[in-house]
Amino acid sequence: MEELDSQRRRLRLEDGKTLSYDRLLLATGATPQRPDLPGKALRGVEVLRSCEQAATLVATVEWEHRLVIIGNSFIGMEVAAALRKQAVEVTVVSPHPLPFEKQFGTELGRFFRRRHQEKGVTFVDGEPAAFEGEKSVSAVTLKDGQRIEATLVLLATGVAPATRFIHDLPLNDDGSLTVDRTMKVSADIFAIGDIATFPLDGNPTRIEHWRVAQQHGRVAAGAMMDKPHPDDAVPFFWTQHYGVRYEYLGHAAKWDQQEIIGSPDEDKFVSLYGLKGNLVAVVAAERMRTTGVLLIKMGDKHGFAEAQRIVADTREAES
């Protein structure tokens, strides 16, 4: 898309065509951010957001076996796990030593780093300064002077809402659109997914995961058909590493309580996150019955103590 004219209810496409609408759903996703560093245009310096980019990455690792991943967030670490299975040498570079520490806390951050190290991933704490090479990338140099050889680099350095074509609607500082509980931006425009900042427990929230976008889509569809069903659903997504699926319920920008029940190293645990006595998020592995019950209870705004009881009651049944 080239430009949205919300006053005239028109969309101008890149090929020059114009579309008119009565109601519009914006689900444009996000655009990977590329650090503005020397060598960023070298062949082999890749991002991952689309199926086409995934196909390029898979095809490239068939003959290039020294991968450096810049960033240790979900996409970066999921790729690390997937490509270690193919015997690719993987080095992860990040200024933040522990993967997912911001989302899951320090203890689970240490666990994920340890698990990836056990599978052969190398971690380097630092920031990239430049990518070296003639036509193709051959190394990454860091700000502290370290040099890491690489035949392929994945930039897992975050994304930005794909809203550059929007000029006549108010955008937030991060480029997203603010929506209400029905995903409405204005009288005839709705937005979902990566570009939508939505209310969650009274707090403006934006979550970058396709599963949450699916939840948003159902809510927006009802509202666009004049059958609004405000979004009270608990955000839910998962991340998978070395055959283990880790489920995340809710959303915790901060918490003042955390309890891990079970053992992450044994791939069976529940981590509860509480704020002011309320349950705000859950991370779990191989506790599907427990997470199913907690997902329902979180929608009813149950407390942290109630969640502890639920985990205890369901633990024996799942052992």
Model regions and ranges:
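A Rossmann-like FAD-binding core segment of flavoenzymes
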Residues: 2-4, 8-13, 19, 86-180
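Short hydrophobic core segments
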Residues: 19-31, 148-158, 217, 277
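Glycine-rich dinucleotide-binding loop and its adjacent helix/turn
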Residues: 28-86, 123
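FAD-site-proximal beta/loop scaffold in flavoenzymes
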Residues: 41-64, 135-141, 147-215, 219
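Cysteine/selenocysteine-centered motifs that mediate thiol-based redox chemistry or coordinate metal-sulfur cofactors
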Residues: 57, 237, 304-319
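Residues at the starts of beta-strands that form the adenosine-phosphate
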Residues: 66, 88-91, 188
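A short, polar/charged loop-to-alpha-helix boundary motif
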Residues: 288-307
